[in-house]
């Protein structure tokens, strides 16, 4: 029988605690799983490269710091909350019960235990996560070294600023932040718990601070002021790294106003701390209040107004004299910090002031015979088309430079490893099995002598000539006696030409650069050559033969095929982290690596050489620089692409040379600066990870280069810090600048010209030397002011020479030389004619000191057909600029002769018919605007012409299935046959 009454709603049942715990555990696993997978696979990887000690030291240090910061921050937070609850009023007034915060007090008291746990845990976790990031600072402090150099103001060794001061700052900043959090908890907590009450005139409520609240807030504030006292003491040292408008370091105002102000404020802060502590015993808060007002007024008057007045009325009218001492300090410290002291740099003042004859220039065979014609920034497509072999091989966009001996003479070479390019795989090659188990490695080492090409290319339309002369060591050439002998004579014969590690291999756009290798029981499956397959036999790689490891990597790369594919067996390994630079950065997380890595051949194996830098954020009076900005140029408009420990540095050394084996990925770190205290500190942190400098083999040392990024940083510094006199430095009159690159693409010509590796005469001995060079122009002027070179030769490595040109005469700079060359009548005429069907590329504009006193500019011109998808750049012409004259010809010898330099030392280049061209100044017109003319084709009969055309067409058809080079030669033969036939009509 219905009563007409609605039954009461059923209460919502809470899920059982077990279900709640299950969901919580699942959520925790989801959060922790990715981190655990990364941790485990990295642990395996570090074991594979034999650097697990680095991994363990970093992890343990970070965990310890996490625990220390978490415990201290959690305890301070808990203690603040504990005193809030302990010191809260026992009774509430009528005003308190009517307060809107009363309900919050009730909520807090009802869940007091939970609040007292959750808030400290949250703060502890946050502090731990922040604190563990400072592992480098802590380890550097624990292993600090002496520099043997002291600052000019306080007399402390630089080691104090490099290792101790950052640690002291970490401690004071951390304590300061923790005390601020504790103060806020006390303030808010006492307000909610009734210990602090704001007054209200409308209700007649008076403000109120309980004794407990006053005591807790006063003690916390007093402790914070004591930390501030320590902060003021450390602030004195920070003045030495302060950046001013003219220089870095403490200025006259800083030393005579800011420094005394810090001491005075320190004393006042100490009195303020005492005033806060007095509030424990005094009910009157006016004493701490007055102390705070005194502190604020002192900060404004003593800390700001006094230095400002001294700056305005004493320093500004006499800045050059007042700042002279401090500018001198800045010059001295900056030179030391960047390795450009007088011990590191040799200045040749008034270089070229005397008369240098053309005969002396021609006799400079070390430079003239090594003039570089191949531009590694342009020729990557040429290498790719002529040496690619298969579509899945490739070369980096920017090739590298190295040097080798040819017939006892040092020559520079464009070098590259033929790597696997994962982004070039065709659609049918991109399934998981092909990509990760078949196409796993590259093949071979390629070198092309930089001062010669195969043949002279006189005709822009010809497909012959103007291409590099390659020496190759790969699987195919090793099987051919003649090519193998050529490689062996050059010193690049590779016993193991397979390339499993390299920057191009690691450039997969999806980040999956791994390869699965090893014996699967079904025989070799990796592509090796068209007629053979291969099974990886190297020591590199992480074992994934067991299901645990396999599952972990399947999770890391989110790839089920690792678990399901038959290509993964009990003997399988996974190769990953295949970029040489990333491998070095991972095993040496304290290094900043150079943006360029390059391959070479050491002991019959392809090795990648990576330059490593030790850096510091700052040193006293040392000018800081941005590594990103300093490395920007026309080739790298965005600066170094490498991850940086810190972008702005005040100290840098190329302390480590790293070598990565291209076959098994082995990483070797070698000490290279035996005097660097920062490296010594890191070797203390990670013992037995860096080999002694004495262990560098002679073969490896012969291929070490002066690193580009360091050179760029040093040239930026030398543009200012070559100046000795503080007065001259202050006026900027003698500053230099790096010229823009006039050969760069439109929009980049104002960017700095990159430095170039060349083989040229050693500044002291005149012998052939492998150098990194760059010109300087005057500040806001285009005329050449100086020329800088750094030696890479084993006996003189790192010696920097700066040739300073006379100031009473002018020498055209790179832009002026480029303008003169490109405005030459014949050059302009040819460019206009050729651009219709060709893309013309201006190669590197080399600024070469020659003959002991003259400057020679050399620039190769490359052409590339527009109407051919497979076209690639070739050397077409060579431009030279010398003493206001322009040389323009298909060969460097002809171009030199046009400007009056006997080219007897220049490299001979074969003509198409097999002859060589080496004109002398007696045989060649030196008129700079006269183009070279082609040898006329001998006339033939009509029947012979038709027969020759038919033969050429047959050869062209037969060459369609051959290489691009064979097809190009067939096209060229057809062109010659047509020309011969037309000349007979």
From Swiss-Prot:
Compartment(s) of residence: Cell membrane
Membrane topology, record value: Multi-pass membrane protein
Disulfide bond positions: none
Pfam families: UPF0182
Region (Disordered): 906-944
Origin: domain of life: Bacteria
Main location: membrane
Membrane-spanning residues: 19-39, 63-83, 115-135, 176-196, 215-235, 262-282, 290-310
Alphabetical keyword list: Cell membrane, Membrane, Transmembrane, Transmembrane helix
Family in the record: Belongs to the UPF0182 family.
UniProt protein name: UPF0182 protein cgR_0895
